[in-house]
C-alpha cells in the first residue's frame, strides 16, 4: 500500500500534487508550454519544458503502478503516450540541430501551416497525437479524479525532522510526554502499511519495525523542561538522527544563554576579537587585487590558515545563537494556543487572550527574521571556508564537473498559473542569480585574461565570468559578507532582548502578574528573583544548622541558664537569619516560639498569622494551639518544680494561646479559612474552659468564636464597606461621557489628574492583605472566595484607563487633534506624578507606548519636542530595568506624603517571592548529609511576603486633601466602560495611518519601547522583498552571466 500525500503526514509545499486532477492540470500546462517554446524557436526553453514534461509523464506512469490501475485500456494508452513522447523528442532534437537558427526562425514564423517544413509539420502532428492520448488518459481516469495520490516527491515526515540544520525550538513536539513512541504515530502507520504490516493499533507493531528514535527530535524538550542542546551545524550536522549516526559535537554548556545584556556583551566581545583578524585578511585581499604580481602560493596558504582560525573563533558566537533561551516566546505561543499545555488551572480572560494573540502575531515576524539570519550566518560561514579552500587550488573549479547542473528544486512542482516562458528559463538557471553589477567591485581585468576569455566564449557557450581569473576578489567579497553577518547577529540578539523586555514590561505595567509568571515558566534563572535592594538573595534549598547570629547565641545562653523544665523543647529546630529574624524551623518549633511569653516578637506574630495557611491547614493550626494550651509537664518533677513550671510556663503559655487565638479571629480571619473539620475542635467549649480557668482574654475569645461561627454560619473578621463615591461610580449614573476629542480637551489637566487621584486612592484603600494573598496563592491553600475583589477592581480600573487613553487617540481621524490629545494626556500624566499618583501615570504612559499609539509617525511629528521629552522623563521613571529601580527610589523619598503606588511592582514582588523561593529548607549538619527535606519551613519566605504587604498597607494610611468634583469623577468612571481592546484599536491605528515608514520615537533613548517596535515596518507590504534583500542567497557553483554578443 503506497504512502499517500497527506498534509497531516508530510511537510508539503503549497504546489505539491495531492489529487489526480492537480497532476492532470500540471501536465497539460507543461504540454502547452513545450509546444509554445517549439514554435517560438527557443531551443533552451524548449529543452527545459520538455525535460519537465517528461518528468511529469514519468510521475503519471508511477502513479498508475502504485494505484494498481491495471486495466488494459490504461496500459495501452500509457504505452502509446510514452512512445509518442519519445518520437516527439527525437524529431524535435533533429529539427533544432539540423537547421540553422535563421532558417528555423523563418519557418516557425510562417502563419500558413502548409508552408512550414515537412519535418516541423511531422513534429506538430506527433504532438497533436500526444495531446489526444493525454486527453484520453484523463477521460479514462476521470472516476479517480478525487483520489489522493501517493507521495512521489521527497518530503519530510512531520514531527520527525526539524527540516533545518540548526536549532529551532518552535519545531519541537509540544507534548513529547504523551507520545507512546519516539516516532510520530501517523508516520509509523504509513511506513508499516507500505511495508505490508497491517496494524490498527501502533502498539501491535513489532518493536523491530518501529525504528529508532530521532535524536534530533526526541532530545528536544517541552517549553518548560530544561534545554538539552546539541551544537548543530557549527559547520556540519547529522540530520538522519538514527541510532547509528556518526559522532557529533555536543555543546559543553549545560544551560542556555539568557536573553540579557550579559549575553549580548559576550557576542560583542567575540566579534571585536574577530574584527582585527578579518580586517587584516581584507587588507591582504585588496593588496593582491591592486597588484597581482604579489601572488604566491604561500600567501594563499597563509590566508587559508587565517580563515580557519577565524572560523574557529566564530564557534562561540554560533554556540550562543544556537543556545539562546527563547523560553518566553515558546510560552507565549503555548499561552496563545487554544490547546495550551500548562497543567495549572490558568485563568485567562478575554483581554489577556487578545493581548497574547496580538503579541504572538507581532513577534512572529521578528522570530522568523532571526531564524533566517541564523541560516544566513551558517551559509556565509560555509561559503567563507569553501572560498578559502579555492585559494590553494591550481584550478579553483576543478571539482565543478562533480556538481549537478540543475539547481535545487528543479523538478519541484509549480503552480500552472506561475509557469510562463520567462520563469521557465529562470527555473533552469536557478532562482539564486542576483544582479552581478551590484556584487562586483570595479577593477581592471588582465589583458591576457580578456583574450583567453573571448577565446573560451567562441568555443563554449557555458562560461565563467571574469571572477574565474581573480580568486582574491571572491575571497574579499566573502570576507565582507562574513563581516556584515557578524554585525547582523549582534543586531538580532539585541532585538530579541528588547522584545523580551518589552513583553514583560507591558505585562507588568498592565499588572498581569499571572501572565508574567507563565511567560517566564521554565526559563533559566526563573525563581532567583530579587525583590529590591533591601531584600535578601533568594533562598537556597540548603542551610546549615550553625547559622545563628550573635543575638541568638546570647538569647540561647539565657535559655540554658533556666531549669530544664522551663526551657523550650524545640529551640534546636529553629534557624535564625542574619537580620535577627526566624529563617526557618519545624512546625513544633514555630508554634512553640509563637506561644512563648518571655520573648515577644511582634513581626513574627504578624507574619505567622498572615501566612499560616501556607504552613498549616486551619484545623491543624488551631489544633497545635490547643495542644500548647494543654501542655504536659516534664517527667520527674518534684512538687516545687511542678508549681514553678505551672506558674512560669504553663499559665503564661495558656494566656499567650488565648491571646493569639483572639487576635487571629478578630484581625486575621478570612472566610476562605473555613474547613469542615473545624467543628470537631469545639472552639466554643475550649473558650468556656479557658474562662473557667480564669485565663486572661478568654471572655473576648468566646465572643469572637461565637461571632465567627454563630449558628453555623462562618463570618469574616471585617466586612469592608465601599465609600459613597465608589457606589456612585459603580451605579453608572447617566451623565456626560468623555467620548469626543473636544470634551476631553475641555477638561483642565490639573482637574482631570486630581479627580483621577481621588478616585484611584479610594479604590486602592479597599485592597486587603487577603486580596493580595489570594492573587498569588489562588486556590493553592484556601478556597476561592471573592477572587480578590478589591485588588481586581483596582487593576481593572488602571487597565480600563489605559484602553480609554489609547482608544481616544486612535478613533480621532484628524491628525492635529490626535497630536493635541497626546499632549493633553502627557500633561495629565505629569500632574499625576506631581500628586504621587504613580498608578494613573503608568496607565497613561502605557497607553501612549502601546502599539496602536506608538506607531503613529505623523501624529508624533506634530507633538512638540518639549512635550515628547516630558513623556520620555515619565517613561524613564517607570523603566523596569533593574526591577524598577528609579521608581523604587522615588517611592522611598516620599516618607509620609499621600501616594497611589503602581501596584504592578508589588504584584511582581509578591509573585516572584512566592514562586522563586522554596517552601522548605534542607538542613545539613556539616558532612553528615541531607536530612528530611520537608521538615523545616522556610519562614524567611513568609517574612518577605509580609514586608511587601506592609508597604502596601502603609500607603493606605495617608489620604489626599483634595476637593471632589463628583461630575468629573462620574464622567471618568462612565467613560472607561465598553472600550475596544488592543487588537481593535490596532486596526483603527492602521486605518488612520496605514503606511508608516520611519517611526518617530517619543523616547528615543529609552529601552522601554513598545513591544511593537518596528512592527509596522513588518506588515505584509514589502515584507518579502525586505527579507530577500537582507538575507541574500548565494551559489557555490559556477557563476552564469549573459554572454557578450558574438556574431553568428
Swiss-Prot record:
Keywords: Cell cycle, Cell division, Guanine-nucleotide releasing factor. Residues 578-710 form the N-terminal Ras-GEF domain. Residues 1035-1048 have a biased composition (Basic residues). SUPFAM superfamilies: Ras GEF. InterPro entries: Ras-like_GEF, Ras-like_Gua-exchang_fac_N, Ras_G-nucl-exch_fac_CS, Ras_GEF_dom_sf, RASGEF_cat_dom, RASGEF_cat_dom_sf. Residues 212-224 have a biased composition (Low complexity). One of its GO terms (biological process) is small GTPase-mediated signal transduction. Residues 208-242, 419-444, 997-1048 are annotated as: Disordered. One of its GO terms (molecular function) is guanyl-nucleotide exchange factor activity. Residues 1010-1032 have a biased composition (Basic and acidic residues). Residues 748-995 form the Ras-GEF domain. Promotes the exchange of Ras-bound GDP by GTP. This is Putative truncated guanine nucleotide exchange factor SDC25. It comes from Saccharomyces cerevisiae (strain ATCC 204508 / S288c) (Baker's yeast).
Amino acid at each position: 500500500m503506497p504512502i499517500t500525500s497527506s498534509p497531516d503526514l508530510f511537510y508539503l509545499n503549497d504546489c505539491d500534487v495531492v489529487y489526480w486532477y492537480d497532476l492532470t492540470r500540471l501536465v497539460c500546462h507543461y504540454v502547452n508550454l513545450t509546444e509554445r517554446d517549439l514554435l517560438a524557436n527557443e531551443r533552451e526553453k524548449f529543452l527545459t519544458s520538455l525535460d519537465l514534461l517528461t518528468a511529469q509523464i514519468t510521475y503519471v506512469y508511477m502513479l498508475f503502478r502504485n494505484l494498481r490501475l491495471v486495466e488494459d485500456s490504461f496500459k495501452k494508452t500509457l504505452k502509446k503516450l510514452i512512445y509518442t513522447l519519445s518520437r516527439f523528442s527525437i524529431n524535435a532534437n533533429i529539427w533544432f540541430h539540423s537547421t540553422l537558427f535563421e532558417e528555423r526562425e523563418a519557418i516557425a514564423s510562417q502563419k500558413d501551416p502548409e508552408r512550414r517544413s515537412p519535418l516541423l509539420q511531422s513534429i506538430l502532428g506527433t504532438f497533436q497525437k500526444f495531446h489526444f492520448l493525454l486527453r484520453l488518459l484523463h477521460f479514462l481516469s476521470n472516476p479517480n479524479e478525487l483520489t489522493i495520490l501517493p507521495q512521489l516527491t521527497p518530503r519530510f515526515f512531520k514531527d520527525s525532522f526539524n527540516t533545518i540544520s540548526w536549532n529551532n525550538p518552535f519545531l519541537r513536539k509540544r507534548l513529547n510526554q504523551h507520545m507512546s513512541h519516539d516516532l510520530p504515530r501517523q508516520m509509523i502507520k504509513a511506513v508499516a502499511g507500505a511495508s505490508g504490516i497491517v496494524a490498527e493499533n501502533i502498539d501491535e507493531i513489532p518493536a523491530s519495525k518501529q525504528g529508532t528514535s530521532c535524536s534530533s527530535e526526541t532530545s528536544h524538550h517541552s517549553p518548560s523542561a530544561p534545554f538539552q542542546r546539541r551544537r548543530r551545524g557549527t559547520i556540519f550536522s547529522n540530520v538522519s538522527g538514527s541510532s547509528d549516526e556518526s559522532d557529533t559535537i555536543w555543546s559543553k554548556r549545560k544551560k542556555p544563554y539568557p536573553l540579557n545584556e550579559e549575553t549580548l556583551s559576550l557576542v560583542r566581545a567575540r566579534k571585536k576579537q574577530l574584527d582585527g583578524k578579518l580586517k587584516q585578511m581584507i587588507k591582504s585581499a585588496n593588496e593582491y587585487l591592486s597588484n597581482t604580481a604579489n601572488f604566491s602560493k604561500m600567501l594563499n596558504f597563509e590566508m587559508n590558515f587565517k580563515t580557519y582560525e577565524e572560523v574557529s573563533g566564530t564557534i562561540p558566537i554560533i554556540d550562543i545563537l544556537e543556545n539562546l533561551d527563547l523560553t518566553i516566546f515558546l510560552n507565549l505561543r503555548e499561552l496563545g494556543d487554544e490547546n495550551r499545555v500548562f497543567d495549572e488551572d490558568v485563568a485567562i480572560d478575554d483581554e489577556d487572550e487578545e493581548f497574547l494573540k496580538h503579541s504572538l502575531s507581532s513577534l512572529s515576524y521578528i522570530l522568523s527574521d532571526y531564524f533566517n539570519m541564523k541560516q544566513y550566518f551558517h551559509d556565509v560561514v560555509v561559503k567563507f571556508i569553501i572560498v578559502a579552500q579555492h585559494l590553494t587550488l591550481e584550478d579553483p573549479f576543478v571539482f565543478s564537473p562533480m556538481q549537478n547542473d540543475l539547481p535545487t528544486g528543479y523538478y519541484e512542482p509549480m503552480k500552472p498559473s506561475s509557469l510562463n516562458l520567462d520563469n521557465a528559463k529562470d527555473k533552469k538557471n536557478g532562482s539564486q542569480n542576483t544582479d552581478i553589477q551590484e556584487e562586483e567591485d570595479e577593477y581592471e581585468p588582465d589583458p591576457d585574461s580578456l583574450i583567453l576569455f573571448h577565446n573560451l566564449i567562441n568555443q563554449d557557450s557555458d562560461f565563467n565570468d571574469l571572477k574565474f581569473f581573480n580568486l582574491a576578489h571572491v575571497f574579499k567579497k566573502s570576507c565582507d559578507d562574513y563581516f556584515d553577518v557578524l554585525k547582523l547577529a549582534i543586531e538580532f540578539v539585541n532585538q530579541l532582548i528588547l522584545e523580551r523586555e518589552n513583553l514583560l514590561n507591558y505585562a507588568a505595567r498592565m499588572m498581569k502578574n499571572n501572565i508574567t509568571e507563565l511567560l517566564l515558566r521554565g526559563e533559566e534563572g526563573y525563581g532567583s528573583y530579587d525583590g529590591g535592594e533591601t531584600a535578601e538573595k533568594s533562598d537556597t534549598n540548603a542551610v546549615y544548622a550553625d547559622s545563628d547570629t550573635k543575638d541568638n547565641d546570647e538569647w540561647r545562653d539565657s535559655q540554658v541558664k533556666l531549669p530544664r523544665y522551663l526551657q523550650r523543647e524545640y529551640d534546636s529546630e529553629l534557624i535564625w537569619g542574619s537580620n535577627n529574624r526566624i529563617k526557618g524551623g519545624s512546625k513544633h518549633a514555630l508554634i512553640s516560639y509563637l506561644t512563648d511569653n518571655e520573648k515577644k516578637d511582634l513581626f513574627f506574630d504578624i507574619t505567622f498569622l498572615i501566612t499560616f495557611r501556607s504552613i498549616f491547614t486551619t484545623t491543624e493550626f488551631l489544633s497545635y494551639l490547643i495542644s500548647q494550651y494543654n501542655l504536659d509537664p516534664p517527667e520527674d518533677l518534684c512538687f516545687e518544680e511542678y508549681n514553678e513550671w505551672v506558674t512560669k510556663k504553663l499559665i503564661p503559655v495558656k494566656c499567650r494561646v488565648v491571646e493569639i487565638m483572639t487576635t487571629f479571629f478578630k484581625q486575621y480571619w478570612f472566610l476562605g479559612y473555613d474547613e469542615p473539620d473545624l467543628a470537631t475542635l469545639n472552639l466554643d467549649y475550649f473558650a468556656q474552659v479557658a474562662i473557667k480557668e480564669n485565663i486572661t482574654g478568654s471572655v473576648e475569645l468566646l465572643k469572637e468564636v461565637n461571632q465567627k461561627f454563630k449558628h453555623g454560619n462562618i463570618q469574616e473578621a471585617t466586612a469592608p464597606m465601599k465609600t459613597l463615591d465608589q457606589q456612585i461610580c459603580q451605579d453608572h449614573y447617566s451623565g456626560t461621557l468623555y467620548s469626543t476629542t473636544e470634551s476631553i480637551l475641555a477638561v483642565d489637566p490639573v482637574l482631570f489628574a486630581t479627580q483621577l487621584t481621588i478616585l484611584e486612592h479610594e479604590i486602592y484603600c479597599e485592597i486587603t492583605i487577603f486580596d493580595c494573598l489570594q492573587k498569588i496563592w489562588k486556590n493553592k491553600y484556601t478556597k476561592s472566595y471573592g477572587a480578590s475583589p478589591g485588588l481586581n477592581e483596582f487593576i481593572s480600573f488602571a487597565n480600563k484607563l489605559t484602553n480609554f487613553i489609547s482608544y481616544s487617540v486612535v478613533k480621532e481621524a484628524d491628525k492635529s487633534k490626535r497630536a493635541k490629545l497626546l499632549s493633553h494626556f502627557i500633561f495629565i500624566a505629569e500632574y499625576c506624578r506631581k500628586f504621587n499618583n504613580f498608578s494613573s501615570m503608568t496607565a497613561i504612559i502605557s497607553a501612549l507606548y502601546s502599539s496602536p499609539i506608538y506607531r503613529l509617525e505623523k501624529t508624533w511629528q506634530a507633538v512638540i519636542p518639549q512635550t515628547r521629552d516630558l513623556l520620555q522623563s515619565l517613561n524613564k521613571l517607570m523603566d523596569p530595568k533593574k526591577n524598577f529601580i528609579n521608581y523604587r527610589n522615588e517611592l522611598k523619598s516620599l516618607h509620609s506624603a499621600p501616594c497611589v503606588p503602581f501596584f504592578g511592582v508589588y504584584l511582581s514582588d509578591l509573585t516572584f517571592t512566592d514562586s522563586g523561593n522554596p517552601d522548605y529548607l534542607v538542613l545539613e549538619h556539616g558532612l553528615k548529609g541531607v536530612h528530611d527535606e520537608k521538615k523545616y519551613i522556610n519562614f524567611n519566605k513568609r517574612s518577605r511576603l509580609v514586608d511587601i504587604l506592609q508597604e502596601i498597607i502603609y500607603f493606605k494610611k495617608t489620604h489626599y486633601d483634595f476637593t471632589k468634583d463628583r461630575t468629573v469623577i462620574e464622567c471618568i468612571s462612565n467613560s472607561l466602560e465598553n472600550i475596544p481592546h488592543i487588537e481593535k484599536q490596532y486596526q483603527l491605528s492602521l486605518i488612520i495611518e496605514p503606511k508608516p515608514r520611519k517611526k518617530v520615537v517619543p523616547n528615543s533613548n529609552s529601552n522601554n519601547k513598545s513591544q511593537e517596535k518596528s512592527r509596522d515596518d513588518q506588515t505584509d507590504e514589502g515584507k518579502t522583498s525586505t527579507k530577500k534583500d537582507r538575507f541574500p542567497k548565494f551559489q557555490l557553483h559556477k557563476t552564469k552571466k549573459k554572454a557578450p554578443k558574438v556574431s553568428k
